From Swiss-Prot:
PIP-box (motif): residue ranges: 913-922
Organism: Plasmodium falciparum (isolate 3D7)
Record-listed Phosphoserine modification sites: S20
Protein's recorded name: Origin recognition complex subunit 1
Name of encoding gene: ORC1
GO MF, one example: ATP hydrolysis activity
Assembly mode: Component of the origin recognition complex (ORC). Interacts (via PIP-box) with PCNA1; the interaction occurs during DNA replication in trophozoites.
Function field: Component of the origin recognition complex (ORC) that binds origins of replication and thus may regulate the initiation of DNA replication. DNA-binding may not be ATP-dependent. In a SIR2A/Sir2-dependent manner, binds to and silences telomers and subtelomeric repeat regions (TAREs). In a SIR2A/Sir2-dependent manner, binds to promoters of var genes localized next to TAREs resulting in their silencing.
Top-level enzyme category: hydrolase
Family from the record: Belongs to the ORC1 family.
InterPro entries (UniProt xref): AAA+_ATPase, ATPase_AAA_core, Cdc6_ORC1-like_ATPase_lid, ORC1/CDC6, P-loop_NTPase
Record EC number: 3.6.4.-
Amino acid sequence: MTPKKKIFQNFQANDNEILSPTKKGIKLNVSKLNILNFENTIITKEKTNYEYKASLNKEIDEVLNNNNIINTHNNKKNNLNLYDYNNIKNSTHEFYIDLNEQNKQTIKYNDNKFTPINKKEKYNLDETSSSSISSSLTNISSSLTNISSSLTNISSSLSNSLDEKKKKKKIKKNNSTIINILNNNNNNSNIHHNNKHNIYNKYNISKKPQNKEIHTLPSNHQIKKKSNNTYNTCQQKMKKNISKKNTHSIKNNQNDKNKEKNKEKDKNIKKDRDKDIQTKRTSHQSQDQNNHFERRILRSYTRNNDNVKNNLKNNINNNNTLKRSSQSVRIDSDLSSAHQNKRIKYDEKNIIHRNNNNNNNNNNKTTSNNHNKNNKINNNNPSENYKKQTDTKHTNNTQNNKYNKTKTTNTFKHPSKDHTDVNTKTFKSRYINTYTMEEVQKSIKSNTIKLVQENSCEYQDGIIYESIQINDEEYSIGEDVLIFYTPNNNTYNAKSDDKKNQNNNNIKENIYLLKKGKISSFYKSTNSKVIEVEICFYYDESDEQRIRELEKKQTSRRCKEDFNIYLDDDTKYYNLLGNIHFTILDANYIYKKIYVYNEIETFEEDTHARKGKNKFLCTHFIKDKEDRLCFIPNEDHWDNLVLGSSDLYYYFANEKKLNKNKSLKLIIEKLKINDKINDTQANQKKNNKKEYMNKAQTTTNVKANTHTKTLNDHNKSKTTKNKESSSTSFLQDVKKKSDPHNNDFQSSLKEDQENYYINLLKNIKDPTDKAIRMMQLDVVPKYLPCREKEIKEVHGFLESGIKQSGSNQILYISGMPGTGKTATVYSVIQLLQIKSRKKLLPSFNVFEINGMNVVHPNAAYQVFYKQLFNKKPPNALNSFKIIDRLFNKSQKDNRDVSILIIDEIDYLITKTQKVLFTLFDWPTKINSKLILIAISNTMDLPDRLIPRCRSRLAFGRLVFSPYKGDEIEKIIKERLENCKEIIDHTAIQLCARKVANVSGDIRKALQICRKAFENKRGHKIVPRDITEATNQLFDSPLTNAINYLPWAFKIFLTCLIIELRIINEFVIPYKKVVNRYKILIETSGKYIGMCSDNELFKIMLDKLVKMGILLIRPYIPLENISKNKSKEALLGFNESSKKGNNQKITRAQVSPDIDKESGDMGIELNVETQLIITALMKDPDCSKKLNFY
């Protein structure tokens, strides 16, 4: 027979990535680390198909009212609809395997001795321990049933006797039995309390047949198993107790009425007995059903508040006789004493303190003589009294009694000595499966660990591994293991005083537990040889105290919303399902692999894994959350969460805290992945670097890495350092030249460009991937093709300015977007840096301000200040004063020349234009040593400036014209030199022509080619593919709307595009568009007569403006009309006269030359030009006109 396949529970369906909470930046795979999100977990609610028997309810109520022996006040404290720890343990099934496993036997650590215990019976999932509240209620109910049964025996004995003296003696005997029963009941609750920490020992205890001769009350396990047959067991035991106990006085409230009631009770009990036997054969109730049954008992008798409250007042004085002994401290006493002293924790250190307090309280009380004697016996001889209780327990609880016996005897025999020995035993009894340091060291002594280099990555000062091998067995991320763990590392231990912690520090260091957990990652630091494992622990029996603290906090809350206040940060942010917390341990302490399930069905179906060996069930919910507990607020970032590619860190927040806490944060230290490309480039840089110390006092040198910069990488203003970054080939060529003044920079740059492309594509094998990489915008070579003229002009301007120490040097560069303005400037700066490094030019510094990144134009002073002095800038005014003082020095100094590049200078224009005037005025100072380069995307910026600003731009202007079709074709061919075979020559021509007809933006051409390569991967690109890629990039609802416009509207837009190309301005005169439209209509031969209809022009213009395609602007062609007149005169404003002139003031008039030229109305495009051209190219007539012009 072949074993069945392993069935594992799929804890999470989504294969996403997260970051580790301990390393703060380590990306992990949630498909492997699947404990954080159990989407498929199905929580079955407790069944509520239980019926409460009316007869039992009535009998309990009558006994409560008649005898008044229950302190209902303490019971009401526990009568809360809250989850408790013992109930939680019902849903968490624990199995463990000890170190020494031979012949299916487990060794239990008890009093420093190993005792083998046979473990042959299979574990029953339905048999678990009950909650503390329900167990106390069952003890009360059992005592009540014993009392009722004893009363029936009393009545029967009274009716059969003939002699009155004999009656009195028997009554005394029975009364004494009642008192002894109550004392035994209290002692039994004490046994339950002392054994509470060892509640999991029942899995390792071998069951033996019960000894019927021993007379005790039923244990907690028997009450749960025989909850339907309690009267039968109690009545048999009471008959034996009556014959053994001494006589005692009885109260006078036993009347004839009670005799009749007892007879009726006997009849009802017999009927219930028969029913219970039948139900016991047919039904096997689970642990949750018993707990629910006991809760219903509690609710039933608390509903009879009238009788209970009345009897409570009368029973307060009588309850002193039934005070708990020194051994029977219950949970209620802890809750009641919390208001007077510190809350007593359920820890091993407080057992002595708790017993001593009870002794003192019992000695100070004064009651009747009989009760005083009992208290003295309990105080003086606690161990003997406790031995009597343990003797009456069943054999299957003997081992628990041994633990309790060691606790009590040690605490009273050595009250004055140090309690270290006591604490060691109590501590070991606190946790199950504890091991000493010697045992653990023996087991891990022979371990051999091997690292698996596959899928490893660098992190800070070490390396993270996905898997390791321990004794030739591989352990990887996401696997469940058993690991040795010291309790002193547990952050969830209860807080206590420093003195108490000092007593047990040495003890906890020598104790190890076997805990379940899921592996998150492995880490090895370069400074140490230890391999660390990050592990997330599951819920375990050692976390009992933590859960109890949560229960107490929950009971003290007023409403559910305030419950989060009482929780710590670990519970708030790591409210995970079925686990406790993350921690980092030594990987050598991993014991073995296990399998963990969160559903009973899958747990039972997996028959291949053995129970108690490597098979575990974990269904614990810390805060009873049914929904998903791991939240990522922004789902758009899931796609970017690949190992090493993202710098985002996510906190795990609760659903309530999600709106308040944004869980997205940036990580300062990013992961360093083993990238071969980056390594090769870094090695080249290290071989070529040579540092030169500059004389600069306030600035640093320039770092020129323009081959890795993109046209968009210069958005952030920053100071660059002057370091060597060119390749070795270029340096060798420079060294070979004998005369440095006759260097051919163009030829050297071309060779450097070829080497740059070769190094970039070295590790890429697929031709399509090579083409896609070359079409990306970040690939910017040092040599820019088709810009030789502009490079020479910028080079000559900057070289002369540096040699002249930057006196009165300002250059204004304008042009359409994507024409290479910024890239040209930085390529020239790189050439000048090479000369400066060869001592052909003086050293210089480069600073940059991007107008788009400045919040306000005045903030440009702060950006410039930070780069100049490398300090945090003050406010804008103080920054301006300090910089202005620097550039307005009257004496010369040893400062290097500074080059200031202002990109997107249009965004620095204000109403008064003070910022631009200041920036343009600084280079004109004698000792400023400042060179200014202003870059703008608008052609008419100088015309919009005030005269004092415009006059300072008269030193130099440079216009970058858009790329033409042949130039775009040349650039694409040079980039695709290494993969020519995957694209057709006609496809390149079509792409270049389309882009040149629109805007001449080279970035658009690169995007179209890359889109075509991505769509037709592995196939040769043809013109049809270029057309499809263009439509995908530029198609929009607007282009579809233009396609459905009438033919006259399309011709009008075509005329507008043609005039835009001719004039090269943003605002086109309306009359010129109309004249162009008349010419096209007349030459086309269509719709003759439409050209003279002025109403048609108004309709077309109004329609296009309403669609949002056009805007109407005022148009005043100042330069074309009169070059000799000033701006004020052309606008019709009379110039202000000087003082002393008696000229008359006239009205402001518009010059008549304006109307003669082109009128006062202009048209401006309100959408991207490419969208309109894409729509017009689909019309044959419009496409012919656009291609012609």
